[in-house]
Structures are given as C-alpha cells and as structure tokens.
Amino acid sequence: MDNNQAVSALWSCASATCLSLDAKRHSLEPSSPDGQASLDVNNKSAPVDAHARKLRHIAHTPRGSCFMALLLLLLLALNFRHAHSCGPGRGLGRRRERNLYPLVLKQTVPNLSEYHNGASGPLEGVIHRDSPKFKNLVLNYNKDILFRDEEGTGADRVMSKRCREKLNMLAYSVMNEWPGVRLLVTESWDEDHQHGQESLHYEGRAVTIATSDRDQSKYGMLARLAVEAGFDWVSYVSRRHIYCSVKSDSSPSISHVHGCFTPESTALLESGAEKALSELAIGDRVLSMDTKGQPVYSEVILFMDRNLEQVQNFVQLHTDGGAVLTVTPAHLIAVWQAERQTLEFVFADRVEELSQVLVHDATGELRPQRVLRVDSVQSRGVVAPLTREGTIVVNSVAASCYAVISSQSLAHWGLAPMRLWSTLQSWMPAKGQLRSAQDKPTPKDATAQQQNGIHWYANALYKVKDYVLPQSWRHD
C-alpha cells in the first residue's frame, strides 16, 4: 500500500469512527420535531460534506480533540515527502544501501604516509605511565570488544579519546556485519617498546585488530569497516591483522568538530547595520539566503557553538569582488555551478580557485563571484549562529549554518526540533515581562549571557552521525 492509499484508508476510517460516535450521541438526544433523528447514518444520499461536519463536531469534544491530534500526526507521517534542496546530498528519507568493497592486502586508506597531515599526522612523542600526557589517555571497557592483553597490565585498553571513539564505532559495525563475532584488539598503547622507533602505539593512537573468530577471510572487510568508522589511517598490513591509527586529540584539525566563523566576521542586520558575530544575540534578524538563492532576513534562534578563546585552523576564501570569508574547513559554503545552473553546498576546504560563491553586492542581490585564492589561516575564537532559515550571509558571502554533514537539507531537517522549540518559546511569556522594567536585560547583557562552548543538541547530533551516516556523507 502506498502513502496515498494509506492516507485515504486512514481518513475513511476516521470519518466512519466520527460518524458512529456522533450517531451514538444523537441516539441519546430527543428526536427532531418532524420525528426524524438528527442524523441518519444509513441515508446513502447524505451530502458528501457530512464527514467534514462530523469531524468538526468531534474536534470540539475533549476526547475528540485528542483523537484529531493523533489523526493529524498519522496523516503527516504517512504523507511525508522527501525534502528537495540545492545541496549535494541525496535528500531526506531512506538511505540507499551502499556496496562496501574490502581492502586488499597491503592497501592503505588514505594512500598517504601515516604521518601526513591528511592521514594521522606527525608523531608527538612517546607517552610513559609517568608522562604528563598519560592522564590524557583513557581506558576502553567496551563489552563488545575483546582485548588480548598479553602483558596482563591492561595496556591494550589504554588509548587516546579519538582512538576509543573510532574503536567503539568499529565494534558496533563488526557486530552488525557478522552477528556473533566481536572485534579483537591485539595491541593498543605500548609501554614495552615492542614496535619500531617511530610508532603511534607509543602515544595510544594506534591499534592492531582482528575478529574474535580469527577468520582471515573477513579481514579485508574489517579494514573497510575501520575506514567507515573514521580511523584516519587504515592498513591491511598482513593476513593476520589490520592496523589503524588516528590523529592526535590535540590536533587543530579535530580540536573543533563543528563548523564556525571567526568572532570578528560580520553579519548584516535587518536594520541595515553590520554586527560582529561575537556580539550577535538570539532574536537578532540577520541576512540569510532562502532555498531559491534569494536574500532574506532570518532570526538567530541559537548558537551551535561559541568559544572566543578556541584557537582553530580556518579556510579563507578571497573573491574577485574583494569579499573575504574565514570559516572552519568542515563548514558548508554555497557554491554556484554555472554549467548546471544549480546551487550546491560544499565543504569549505573543498572549494577550489575559480569556484563561484554567492556574494551580497551593492544592488542588494546575491550574485556569483569567482574565488581567486584559498588560504589556510589560524585564528582565535569560533562562533556558529543558527538562523531559522539554516543559512547566513557572513562578510557578504552566503554560507550554510551547518557543517560536518555534506547535505544541507539533511542537516536542516536534523535541527527541526530546535526550530520547533524556538517557536514554542516565542509563545511563552518573555522573562523580561516577569520583571520590572528596570530589571529587563539589555541587548548587551543578552550577548554576554551567551553559552560558552558547543550547544548540547549540536554535540548530540555530532556523536550520532557516525552511527547513521556513511563516511562519504561526513567530513572526517
């Protein structure tokens, strides 16, 4: 049964239920003066709009109101349609099954040196039990992982936070791929110097893994699952095990997991004034972009992140019109595809020279300008405002409010609960109305009261994404 048939059947069922309830009510009331009941449910010639009249009547009773609310929710759920967006994702709805191809012996992903910045990054130094950095390592007690622990010291459970995160993700994938089989860790942090002089095992950033059944035919796929889990470098190093490693927890490329702008970047208010992002407050209406690429003003409903002290790597885009946008690498930027006449959202670190971004010009329109130069810079402070529209124009350049996930429409859908909550809050009495006029906070006070750090909901979405989205949809 398709959605339309289901909706039709549900509506018919609801109508019949309402009619029967109404008939029962009228059977307990006096007849009309002409001796006929108010409603003859057996009358085949009754007007078609009788259903609507009865539904309206039922909706005015307490029980009927609950029934109608549930009915509406069911109708909305059954009549749900995929969202369309100019973003590059596949849209909302059911994810297509993807074919995962196992790695072959001696293959590495990515095909770079392990110590390259595009892989796990450079060595930072051996960590001993008495090293100051040892306290930054964590223990992994995941019951879905077997730790061989040949040394009997528990060292195989010791690892960096990022390594634990990716290992737990891999354990989940292994159980789904092979029911009854668990992930086996044969080596993690090494304090006995049993590896080469340069090894990330000494920093708790590397693991060697296998499956609990020791079935070597599974190891190629195990390596692929490790890639999907987000390990920064995976090697099918031998027929006996797989080697995986991660970036340092202090690496600038992962120290900030969400997309943000610099605090000194500016947004255009509806009043025509420009305001630094560090001074924006919830409720400000700023220039944004609608789904058709047209400029609109949209309300700031929350800050997904705000940290004025965080030192972070940024991508800096320079356009031929003089606009400069500084943004974190995983942030989505609106890019105009002239050949296809479409607008797509692309990760900032994947925007290339001669790409076209939308810039708010003197005419008040958003028009394409070519990117002349792409730089990498480091700066202090990150701010990530979320508008109701899901987009924002910063330093005159149109950008998404979202990052990490490649689909603008999917990210926007994921923040729907926060938009709903913001709407509900707008219906409630404002805090200022409960105080005297003298105590009402000023906009400057409201800005000062902004949260410091990642918003709890944005952080929750970040943690969930690895479980529900393939790596190709993520910026890892």
Swiss-Prot record:
Gene3D superfamilies: 3.30.1380.10, Hedgehog/Intein (Hint) domain
Residues engaged in binding Ca(2+) 1: E150, E151, D156, T186, E187
Enzyme Commission number(s) from the entry: 3.1.-.-
Entry-linked InterPro entries: Hedgehog, Hedgehog_Hint, Hedgehog_sig/DD-Pept_Zn-bd_sf, Hedgehog_Signaling, Hedgehog_signalling_dom, Hint_dom_C, Hint_dom_N, Hint_dom_sf
Signal peptide: 1-20
Residues with site note (Involved in cholesterol transfer): D305
GO biological process: anatomical structure morphogenesis; cell fate specification; cell-cell signaling; intein-mediated protein splicing; protein autoprocessing; regulation of gene expression; segment polarity determination; self proteolysis
Localization terms from the record: Nucleus; Cytoplasm
Chain residues that bind Ca(2+) 2: E151, E187, D190, D192
Marked site (Involved in auto-cleavage) residue numbers: T328
Annotated site, Cleavage, chain positions: G259, C260
Enzyme class: hydrolase
Propeptide stretch(es), residue numbers: 21-85
Similarity annotation: Belongs to the hedgehog family.
Protein name: Protein hedgehog
Organism: Drosophila mojavensis (Fruit fly)
Gene (name only): hh
